[in-house]
Each structure stands twice: as structure tokens, then as C-alpha cells.
């Protein structure tokens, strides 16, 4: 069962490594079956920051700090609770130093087979380092080892809309099934006898090929669903009901949901079934058309439906995606993926070298293309407009369209170009993003947008940038990086891709074209902004180089101090005194005891204090001492680790607007209030 929601504790566990460990250079992470001292079993995702070896199938007695899967909650982005539930993950854990081997790994299990395949590719990569990225792509396409691809490659796939091609999904499994079915059909032509029911053998061969590939890829939940879907389609065709694509589609959907009800939580399920439905819808009554016409029509159907699905789910549309996918899908499906499988089943150096060569130059071409490929931010549309957009997309796919296709185009354009209503003059909307154990604050006026810090690279990619898009931020007027620390500027590259007119930093030497955030004042749309600097008596540590921003709208103020410590706070008090007074204070250093001194809280005298920290973080931020100091001053403490992103409206009577995302499903834990 799932790890209890409120329990975060150090435990002695017996763990068995269930899958290949992934090393991202910072930690080794792997899935494990774990048993506590009472014998209760859990499926955990464990992280080892000491980056030790963990053989697949080995069993260990370990000390670990285990917590439930609680992630960031923003208006858009990755929802870790949904991901964990859909993938059967009960909890997360960080391994301590103590471990004792209980049983060696090895054997002939599925995980061991995948580990052997990975090592064979790695040996070739070690021998030919000039093809290391190509080897990484082959490992990703054959056994689903996504960590083999460098982060810059993942960043290149996103603006091209190609992430689905390097994450083994329904597309890969389907193409392998088609390839196996085609091979069996070709083999039958050369047999002296033909089975009485060749269709059965062809369909069975396709499903068997899909199952083999899914097993090689680790038999993850998405690949399991893909095999189930294909098996259901094959069954429908064998029983004779495949003449109607819709009959097979409904039967496949029913089978998947009956065997795996949690499939409804997976974005991949909706994308897979949605795109297949679009293809069936677009080809209805046109099966006599030539192959290339059907292919073009299928690409058109997938593109139209993707406008709504990708715009809503990811708040972004890769503009070159239709063209790039039209070329990349056949290349990946019929060349690179078969070569990846061939090099895995027959791990000869020549086979793997040819595959790596083609993959390497494919990646180099995509990296170049990604530099010139734009993305279009799609703001979160109201539910009525979303429903109308989906109906418009389906209408465009109809053969005739009932004469309403021009109206459908207008609705889709309205969905894509929708923007939230502008703020009033003299009002600032402040969104303290849920950046985990990091910081990112968006400040919006009527016509301007300023972002203070970006959070970590992962949070920026999976939460901050999608949320900026969803809130209608197409470009930043200013980006402030308080200081050079991974939890404050780690997502700089990802956020910079959104575009910014001005970059300010406490340590500008670490960023291109950055200016030092010296003392300054300016006004946007009737809202005053002020950059503050502590007196010369402040500390010289990196944290004390943090930019300090104060925003005032209609007499209501916000103060952000980055990671400024007590020395820096004392320097601010010495220089500005009671001019620091603000209704909202973002606590320094995530609520660490090294900041938020009693004298500073007394001087600022905020109504609200916000701690931006990660749930159950190892530093125990906000610390008990800081919480006690805040409450002793009569200040309301708000926490992103418990509430998710928080919204304030400076310049209005009700400053605190509540959580950014107010609704949640009954099974979700966060927001906790």
C-alpha cells in the first residue's frame, strides 16, 4: 500500500533492486521492492546520493528516510502524486550510509536481461566516445533507459515536439507490432504451406512482438497499457469486429480500463487513445484512398487534435512539430528503433556501431533544428472554451463539417490565442510558485511580468515554465536571479528560453549579459519596484550577495530577500530601517534558522510570511525556531510545501488570494489545507 501521508521517518528496510539504477551525475535512483520491520511491503523509488553500485536483483538491509510522494502543485506541470499512483509507486526514499548485503543479484530475470543489454551498449560507447549520444539514444529506444540521454538533448526534444519519440510509448510498441506482423506475413510467402488462418498468426505475431519489446523496455505501466490496447485491437479484428475501427477502439478502451482503472490518470492514455480516435475519425469512409493520402490525412488529424490536447496539458505548442514529426516518426519507427532492437538482441560491435552512427547524426541534426524552433505559449483557457475547442477540432476532422468548419477554425484560434484579463492599473499580482526546495516568484502588473528566481532545473522544466505559459506570460520584462545557487538559478536556461528583456543578478559573472542588481527604483503600470542592498556591514558569503526586491502597490508591499542571512538582514535594517515595512514577506533561505531574525521580523512587521520549501525536505525548512518566531510576532505563516503555489494581490483590500490551484481530487494529499 501507499506510504502513509503524514509519515516521514528514518527506517530500517530490506530492499530488493527491481530495475536498473539510473545515475544522473548527482545521485543513483532505482525502483525497489521494500519491506519494513513489520514485513509490510512497499514499492519505493530510492535515491542514493553516494552513487554506489546496486546490482539488479540484489537484496540489502538499508537505512532510509522514506516519505510519501508529494510534489509541487502549480497551475500546470508535472503532478507527482498522479505519476506515482499511475505507475504503482508507493513512496520515495533517500538512502543513508548503512547498508548490508543480504543476497547477491544476477540470474536470468527481466531486469537482469535489461541490465546486460545496457552494459553491452555501454561497452561500445566506451570504445567509441564520439558516438556517446547516439549510444544513449539506442539505450533509450531499446530498454527505456532515458537517463542515458543528456539533459541538453531532452531540452532540444521539447520545442520540436519529439519527447514522445524518445520515451517508449504506445507509438513505439505499435510500430514494433506492425513490424513483427509484416515480417511474419513476408515469411509466409516463402513457406511451402500456409497456415489455415494466416490472419491469426499475423495478429498473434504482432502482439508477441509488442510484448517482447515492452518486456525489454522494462514493462512499465505505459507499455503495459499499450500491449493491452494492441491485444484488444487484434482480438477485435480476429473476431471480425475490426471492420469497424470504432468497435475495436471501444473494446480496447474497455479492456485497458477494466484491467487498469488507474490508466485514466495517465496523460499518455488520453494522448494515445485520443490520437487513435482522431485517425479513425479522419479515415472513416476513406479507406479506398491511396496510402500517401491516408498518411497525410492521419498527420492532419493528429495535428488538429494535438492543438487542444498539448495546449491544455502542457500549455505550449511546438510550431515546427507537425513537419518535424512527419519526418521523424518514420525515421525513428522504421530505422532507429529496429536497429536498437537488433543491436540489443545481437550485441555485435558492428551492428551497434552502425546504429550509434545513425543515431548520433540524427541527434546532431535535431539539436541544430531545436535552436531555431519556436514554441507558442497557450494560456489556461476557461472550461467552456476548452470544451468548444475540442468540439471544433472534431468538427474539422469530419468529411463535410456541416458547413461549420470556418467557425471551428475561429474557435480553435480563440483557444490558442486566449489571454487572461488584464489587471487594473496600480495592482500587482504576486504568485509564489511551488518550487519545491527552491524559490520562484512571479510579479505581474497590467502590462509587465517579472520573475524573481527560477528554482532548480527540474522544477523549472516541469513546473515553472508550463505555469508561466498557462498564466499567459509569453515573455518576461525582467528576470532577477538573487544569487548563484542551484535552488534559485538552476532553471535559468529553461526560463531564458521563454525570453526576457532584462537580466539582473546578485552575482552577474555567472550569467551572460547579466547586470548587477544594484540599488534602483522604477515604476510599471502604477506599481513601484525597488532593489535594495544591505549596508557594507553585511556578510560576504554567497547567500549575502542575494538581490533584495520590494514591490509596492497602492500602499501594500511585498519584500523578497532570497537567501539573505541574519547579517544581511541586519545590514538592511541599518540602512533602511522602518522603510522595510511590508504586508507580505517571503522568508529568507526557505525558512532556515540562518535568516528571519526576530529584529528583522519586527522591523518588516508583515501580515503574511511565506516559506518556499520542499515537502519533508532534509533541512527541515521552515525550521521550528523560525515558525515559533513568526507566530510570536503575530504573523500568519504560509507554506508552499503544504499549500502549493500561493497568490497575493497587492493594491487590493484582500491581499491574500489563497492557493493558486484551489481544487484537488479526493485521493490527492496536497494541498493539505
Model-assigned labels for residue ranges:
Residues 1-14, 100, 184-197, 201, ...:
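Transmembrane helix-bundle segments that form internal channels/tunnels in multi-pass membrane proteins
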Residues 569-645:
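Cap/insert and terminal regions of metallo-dependent hydrolase folds
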Residues 1-164, 462-466, 475, 508, ...:
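Membrane-interface helix/helix-cap signal primarily in integral membrane proteins
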Residues 214-223, 238-242, 258-267, 311-319:
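Membrane-interface helix caps and helix-loop-helix hairpins in membrane proteins
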Amino acid at each position: 500500500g501507499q506510504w502513509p501521508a503524514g509519515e516521514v521517518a528514518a527506517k530500517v528496510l530490506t530492499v530488493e533492486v527491481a530495475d536498473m539504477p539510473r545515475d544522473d551525475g548527482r545521485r543513483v535512483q532505482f525502483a525497489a521492492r521494500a519491506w519494513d520491520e513489520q514485513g509490510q511491503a512497499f514499492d519505493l523509488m530510492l535515491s542514493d546520493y553516494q552513487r554506489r553500485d546496486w546490482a539488479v536483483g540484489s537484496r540489502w538491509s538499508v537505512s532510509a528516510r522514506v516519505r510519501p510522494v508529494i510534489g509541487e502543485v502549480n497551475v500546470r506541470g508535472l503532478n507527482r502524486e498522479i505519476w506515482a499512483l499511475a505507475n504503482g509507486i508507493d513512496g520515495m526514499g533517500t538512502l543513508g550510509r548503512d547498508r548490508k548485503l543480504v543476497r547477491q543479484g544476477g540470474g536470468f530475470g527481466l531486469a537482469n536481461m535489461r541490465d546486460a543489454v545496457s552494459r553491452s551498449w555501454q561497452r561500445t560507447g566506451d570504445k567509441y566516445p564520439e558516438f556517446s549520444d547516439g549510444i544513449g539514444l539506442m539505450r533509450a529506444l531499446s530498454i527505456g533507459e532515458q537517463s542515458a540521454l543528456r539533459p541538453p538533448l531532452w531540452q532540444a526534444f521539447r520545442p520540436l515536439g519529439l519527447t514522445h519519440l524518445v520515451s517508449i510509448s504506445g507509438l513505439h510498441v505499435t510500430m514494433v507490432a506492425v513490424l513483427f506482423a509484416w515480417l511474419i506475413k513476408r515469411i509466409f510467402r516463402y513457406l511451402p504451406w500456409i497456415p489455415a488462418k494466416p490472419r491469426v498468426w499475423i495478429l498473434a505475431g504482432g502482439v508477441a512482438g509488442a510484448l517482447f519489446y515492452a518486456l525489454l523496455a522494462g514493462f512499465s505501466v505505459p507499455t503495459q497499457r499499450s500491449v493491452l490496447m494492441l491485444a484488444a485491437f487484434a482480438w477485435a479484428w480476429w473476431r471480425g469486429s475490426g471492420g469497424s475501427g470504432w468497435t475495436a477502439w471501444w473494446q480496447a478502451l474497455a479492456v485497458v480500463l477494466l484491467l487498469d482503472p488507474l490508466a485514466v490518470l495517465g496523460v499518455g492514455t488520453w494522448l494515445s487513445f485520443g490520437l487513435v480516435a482522431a485517425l479513425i475519425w479522419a479515415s472513416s469512409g476513406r479507406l479506398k484512398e491511396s496510402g500517401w493520402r491516408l498518411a497525410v490525412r492521419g498527420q492532419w488529424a493528429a495535428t488538429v487534435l494535438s492543438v487542444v490536447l498539448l495546449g491544455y496539458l502542457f500549455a505550449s505548442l511546438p510550431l515546427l512539430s507537425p513537419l518535424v514529426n512527419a519526418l521523424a516518426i518514420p525515421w525513428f519507427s522504421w530505422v532507429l528503433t529496429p536497429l536498437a532492437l537488433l543491436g540489443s538482441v545481437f550485441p555485435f560491435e558492428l551492428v551497434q556501431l552502425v546504429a550509434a552512427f545513425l543515431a548520433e547524426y540524427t541527434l546532431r541534426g535535431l539539436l541544430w533544428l531545436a535552436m531555431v524552433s519556436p514554441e507558442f505559449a497557450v494560456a489556461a483557457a476557461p472550461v467552456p472554451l476548452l470544451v468548444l475547442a475540442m468540439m471544433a477540432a472534431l468538427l474539422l476532422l469530419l468529411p463535410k463539417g456541416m458547413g461549420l468548419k470556418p467557425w471551428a477554425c475561429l474557435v480553435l484560434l480563440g483557444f490558442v490565442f486566449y489571454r487572461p484579463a488584464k489587471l487594473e492599473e496600480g495592482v500587482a499580482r504576486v504568485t509564489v510558485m511551488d518550487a519545491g526546495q527552491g524559490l520562484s516568484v512571479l510579479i505581474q502588473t497590467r502590462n509587465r511580468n517579472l520573475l524573481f528566481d527560477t528554482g532548480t532545473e527540474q522544477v523549472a522544466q516541469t513546473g515553472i515554465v508550463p505555469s508561466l505559459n498557462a498564466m499567459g506570460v509569453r515573455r518576461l520584462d525582467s528576470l532577477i536571479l538573487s544569487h548563484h545557487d542551484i535552488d534559485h538559478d538552476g532553471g535559468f536556461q529553461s526560463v531564458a528560453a521563454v525570453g526576457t528583456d532584462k537580466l539582473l543578478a546578485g552575482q552577474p559573472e555567472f550569467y551572460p549579459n547579466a547586470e548587477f542588481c544594484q540599488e534602483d527604483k522604477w515604476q510599471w503600470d502604477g506599481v513601484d519596484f525597488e532593489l535594495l542592498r544591505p549596508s557594507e556591514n553585511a556578510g560576504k558569503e554567497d547567500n549575502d550577495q542575494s538581490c533584495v526586491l520590494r514591490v509596492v502597490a497602492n500602499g501594500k508591499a511585498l519584500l523578497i530577500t532570497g537567501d539573505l542571512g541574519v547579517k544581511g538582514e541586519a545590514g538592511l535594517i541599518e540602512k533602511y530601517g522602518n522603510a522595510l515595512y511590508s504586508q507580505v514577506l517571503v522568508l529568507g533561505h526557505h525558512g532556515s534558522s540562518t535568516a528571519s531574525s526576530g529584529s528583522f521580523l519586527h522591523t518588516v512587521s508583515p501580515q503574511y510570511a511565506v516559506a518556499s520549501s520542499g515537502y519533508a525536505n532534509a533541512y527541515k525548512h521552515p525550521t521550528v525556531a523560525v515558525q515559533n518566531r513568526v507566530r510570536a510576532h503575530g504573523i500568519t505563516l504560509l507554506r508552499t510545501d503544504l499549500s502549493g503555489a500561493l497568490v497575493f494581490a497587492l493594491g487590493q483590500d484582500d491581499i491574500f488570494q489563497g492557493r493558486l490551484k484551489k481544487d484537488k481530487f479526493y485521493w490527492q494529499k496536497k494541498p493539505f489545507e
